[in-house]
UniProtKB/Swiss-Prot annotation:
Family listed: Belongs to the class I-like SAM-binding methyltransferase superfamily. CmoB family.
Name of the protein: tRNA U34 carboxymethyltransferase
HAMAP family: tRNA_carboxymethyltr_CmoB (MF_01590)
Subunit: Homotetramer.
Length: 323
C-alpha cells in the first residue's frame, strides 16, 4: 500500500492547495482499492531498493545520482536487476550509481527545447499533467521550483518515480499522484502548469485547456506540448482509428490552430516557441524498453509518413498566460 500522508501534510500547510484535501484522500483510497495485476510484484521490488541520501545529485543538467564511494559490483547488479523489474522505462534517461537507464524517450531533449522559453521556475509551485515517471519534475526542481506535483494514472510510472525518489534520499519537493486531470478540482493554485504529450489523447481538447487554466493562479503560465500538423489556423487532423499505431488519439491541430484554441478559452500572450519533427534518435527501442518504438511506426519506404499514411510525428510547444 502507498502512503500519501507526507503529501497531505504538505498541502495542509499551503492555503492555495488546502481545499484539495476535501476530495484527494478519498480519490487515492479508491485508487488503492482498485487492483492491478503486476502492482504487488513491483511493490515488492521497490521495497528492496536501498534508501539513503547519495553524495552527489545532479538534476540541473541531467538526472544523475552517485556516491563518492562506489557501490560494490554485487550491490550494483542487484540494484540494476530491481530497476529492470519496472520495464518498460519510457521517460528519462537516468544515471543511478553508474547504471545508465537508457529510456525509450530522450526526455532531456524535450526539456532542452522547452527551458529557454519559459518563465524561471525558481520558487514556483508546478503541476505536471501526464508527468510519466516524473523525469521532468526532477529537472524542474533542478531549476529551483519550490514544489512539483505530477499527475499520471499509470501504476508503473508511480513505481518508477518512487524508485528514483528513494535513491535520491526521499526528496519531498516532488510528488506523483496516480490521477487524471479530470479528477482535479478547480484549484487555481499553481504558478506554472505543464501539459506535455497529453492533448491528443483527450476527446475534448478545449475542455482539457480549460482544466489546465483552472489549475493556474492568475498570471500563471501554461506550457503546452503536443503533436501537431503543418497548416494554417483552420488545420486539424482527426485520425481514423490509429496514428503511429497509437489508439485513443483524437485531435492534431496545427500550431497556429492551437494558438487560436488557447485564446478562445481565455489565455493571453500565447506564443508558439518551438516546432520539431520527432527523430528516431529521440524515441526508439532500447534494452530498458524492448517493445516497438517510433522506427516501427513509420512507413519503411517514406519515413515522412506513419504506417497509416499520416504525416510523421511533429511536436509543438506553446507558452501562454492566464489573465
Amino acid at each position: 500500500m502507498f502512503n500519501f500522508a507526507n503529501f497531505y501534510q504538505l498541502i495542509a500547510q499551503d492555503t492555495r492547495l488546502q481545499p484539495w484535501l476535501n476530495v484527494l484522500p478519498q480519490q487515492l483510497t479508491d485508487w488503492q482499492n482498485a487492483e492491478h495485476g503486476d502492482f504487488p510484484r513491483w511493490l515488492k521490488a521497490l521495497n528492496k531498493i536501498p534508501e539513503g541520501a547519495p553524495d552527489q545529485i545532479d538534476i540541473k543538467h541531467s538526472v544523475t545520482i552517485s556516491n563518492d564511494t562506489p557501490f560494490h559490483q554485487g550491490e550494483l547488479k542487484k540494484l540494476e536487476s530491481l530497476l529492470r523489474t519496472f520495464h518498460p522505462w519510457r521517460k528519462g534517461p537516468y544515471t543511478v550509481h553508474g547504471i545508465h537507464i537508457d529510456t525509450e524517450w530522450r526526455s532531456d531533449w524535450k526539456w532542452d527545447r522547452v527551458l529557454p522559453h519559459i518563465s524561471p521556475l525558481k520558487n514556483r509551485s508546478v503541476l505536471d499533467v501526464g508527468c510519466g515517471n516524473g523525469y521532468h519534475m526532477w529537472r524542474m526542481l533542478g531549476e529551483g521550483a519550490r514544489l512539483c506535483v505530477g499527475i499520471d494514472p499509470s501504476h508503473l510510472f508511480l513505481i518508477q518515480f518512487e524508485a528514483i525518489r528513494k535513491l535520491m534520499g526521499g526528496d519531498q519537493r516532488a510528488h506523483l499522484l496516480p490521477l487524471g486531470i479530470e479528477q482535479l478540482p478547480k484549484l487555481e493554485a499553481f504558478d506554472t502548469v505543464f501539459s506535455m504529450g497529453v492533448l491528443y489523447h483527450r476527446r475534448s481538447p478545449l475542455d482539457h485547456l480549460i482544466q489546465l487554466k483552472d489549475q493556474l493562479v492568475s498570471g500563471g503560465e501554461l506550457i503546452l506540448e503536443t503533436l501537431v500538423i503543418e497548416g494554417d489556423e483552420t488545420a486539424v487532423l482527426v485520425p481514423k482509428e490509429r496514428y503511429a499505431q497509437m489508439r485513443n488519439v483524437y485531435f492534431f491541430p496545427s500550431a497556429r490552430a492551437l494558438k487560436v484554441w488557447l485564446e478562445l478559452v481565455g489565455f493571453e500572450d500565447v506564443r508558439i516557441v518551438d516546432e520539431n519533427v520527432t527523430s528516431v534518435d529521440e524515441q526508439r527501442t532500447t534494452n530498458w524498453m524492448t517493445h516497438n518504438s517510433l522506427p516501427d511506426y513509420l512507413d519503411q519506404n517514406d519515413p515522412s509518413k506513419t504506417v497509416e499514411g499520416y504525416p510523421a510525428p511533429r511536436r509543438a510547444i506553446l507558452v501562454a498566460k492566464k489573465p
